[in-house]
A protein has these predicted regions:
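Cyclophilin-like peptidyl-prolyl cis-trans isomerases
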Residues: 1-186
Length: 186
């Protein structure tokens, strides 16, 4: 695989999360998606931010394909903040995406060279991407090539730090960090 550097100012999609703990607003995180590098992964994430694809239907069960109302269920300081479980909201969901239950890995070409790198959390192993993702809270070069890294926090690193402060070494959070609203800016 090839690791490509971040190029500020590129015309890439930008999505956002407005985050809160209880009734306390934490602020907004904006994420620039590298759709030129990982188009399928970025389209899945973008659609899950906008909610434009409706519901995932399996039998009588309907799961909204939207991050609004989802949680950051696992936060480990100096490492990562994980969220996006649309089924169970605690990391144990089977996984859903705009393509069905899961989709294959794309070239993991963004480097985990700073805080704010956004990647898929393929909890079931390789080629098992769904809705769960994580945001790096520091450099993590050992993850290069192991997770599909497709975006970077372009605004709101202070909000990311506020989430990090609610984490623990085991990943449990103090308070429930919720995506109050999300969508696409550009």
């Amino acid at each position: 695989y090839e690791i490509t550097p971040y190029e500020p100012g590129d015309c890439r999609p930008v999505v956002f999360f407005d985050l809160a703990v209880g009734d306390q607003a934490l602020g907004r995180i904006e994420i620039t998606l590298h759709d030129d590098v990982c188009p399928k992964t970025c389209e899945n994430f973008r659609c899950l931010c906008t909610g434009e694809r409706g519901n995932f239907v399996e039998g009588s069960r309907r799961t909204p394909l939207w991050y609004k109302g989802s949680r950051f269920h696992r936060v480990i300081p100096d490492f990562m903040a994980q969220g996006g479980d649309l089924e169970k909201h605690n990391g144990s969901g089977k996984g859903v995406c705009i393509y069905g239950r899961s989709f294959a890995d794309e070239e993991a070409s963004l480097a985990f060279d700073s805080p704010g790198v956004v990647a898929m959390a393929a909890t079931k192993g390789q080629d098992a991407n769904g809705c769960q993702f994580f945001v790096s809270l520091g450099e993590a070069p050992w993850l290069d090539g192991k997770h599909v890294a497709f975006g970077r926090v372009s605004s709101g690193l202070e909000v990311l730090r506020a989430i990090e402060e609610r984490g623990s070494a085991h990943g449990r959070t103090r308070g429930v960090v919720v995506v109050q609203n999300c969508g696409q800016l550009q």
